[in-house]
Amino acid sequence: MNAWNTIYDQFNPIAFSLGSIEVHWYGLAYACAIVTAFYMALRMIQKDPKRFPIERKEFESYFLWAELGIVLGARVGYILIYEPNSSYYLTHFWQIFNPFDSNGDFVGIRGMSYHGGLVGFLIASYLYSRKDLKKLLIYLDLIAISLPLGYVFGRIGNFLNQELVGRVVPKDSHLGQIIGIMVGNELRYPSQLIEAFLEGVIVFLMVLWAKKHTKTHGLLIVVYGLGYSLMRFIAEFYREPDSQMGVYFLNLSMGQILSLLMVIVSLGILLYATKNSKKIKGNQ
């Protein structure tokens, strides 16, 4: 047993308190994710105006729509897909975003679905662009390259919050014994950090490569969608399935099933892009 294995014993998921309000590391990490994605997008607009011909004020307005769509979609998606008591929220919809418990104590909003957030993001992007659909693919591409590094902070936040834990490490896994984290009395894979690397860093490198080697609007979001789906599918083998869900056919988790659906959506966007997008002129 090494110091890393017992790291959860060394810190508290609560970063600090403001009176009766407890501020969790995840909340801070999510704020870092938003800031990172925002300024990454601004940098891309500045460095490559031919691929991203968007004014800053225009982007700021779109970013607000996109973020709102992500939050709404992520929360509603969790309620519909993962929440065992989803029927309660469907009849008490005001409770979906209620950050207080039955005693009036602030507990924050818990339970977000990445794939639900993706649906919300796509809907918000379409609604914002409906008056000028020529820019829809440009907006999607911009988010595709600015989101992954911000996503890293989100998964680190999950790790610090000691949630979405990994599967139990087999006793014969030498690497697992080294990198595993004690959760309760069991050694588990640090699946949140595995996801941060695969779904954040690796996917970013994929999209960055696509940016350098493609000249058609809409291809970056396709590469992001396909890359994320693949990396999430792999990472799910190290992540403990939600207790209320378990696994389905072929022992696939819900995350893996949704990732396969994400592949279909990405291919649909590819078809749309090939029919409606124009070549990007000039050097990138």
From Swiss-Prot:
- Which amino acids does the record list as binding a 1,2-diacyl-sn-glycero-3-phospho-(1'-sn-glycerol)? 155
Listed under GO cellular component are: plasma membrane
Disulfide bond among keywords: no
Q: Which domain of life is it from?
A: Bacteria
EC number(s) in its UniProt entry? 2.5.1.145
Q: What's its top-level EC category?
A: transferase
Q: Which InterPro entries match?
A: Lgt
Q: What pathway or pathways are given for this protein in its record?
A: Protein modification; lipoprotein biosynthesis (diacylglyceryl transfer)
Q: Which GO terms describe its biological process?
A: lipoprotein biosynthetic process
Location(s) in or outside the cell: Cell inner membrane
- Bilayer topology term: Multi-pass membrane protein
Q: Which residues cross the membrane?
A: 14-34, 62-82, 106-126, 136-156, 190-210, 218-238, 252-272
Q: GO terms for molecular function, please?
A: phosphatidylglycerol-prolipoprotein diacylglyceryl transferase activity
Q: Which UniProt keywords apply?
A: Cell inner membrane, Cell membrane, Membrane, Transferase, Transmembrane, Transmembrane helix
Q: What does this protein do?
A: Catalyzes the transfer of the diacylglyceryl group from phosphatidylglycerol to the sulfhydryl group of the N-terminal cysteine of a prolipoprotein, the first step in the formation of mature lipoproteins.
PANTHER family the UniProt entry points to: PHOSPHATIDYLGLYCEROL--PROLIPOPROTEIN DIACYLGLYCERYL TRANSFERASE, PROLIPOPROTEIN DIACYLGLYCERYL TRANSFERASE
Q: Which family does it belong to?
A: Belongs to the Lgt family.
Q: What is the protein's given name?
A: Phosphatidylglycerol--prolipoprotein diacylglyceryl transferase
Q: Which organism is it from?
A: Helicobacter pylori (strain Shi470)
Q: Which gene encodes it?
A: lgt
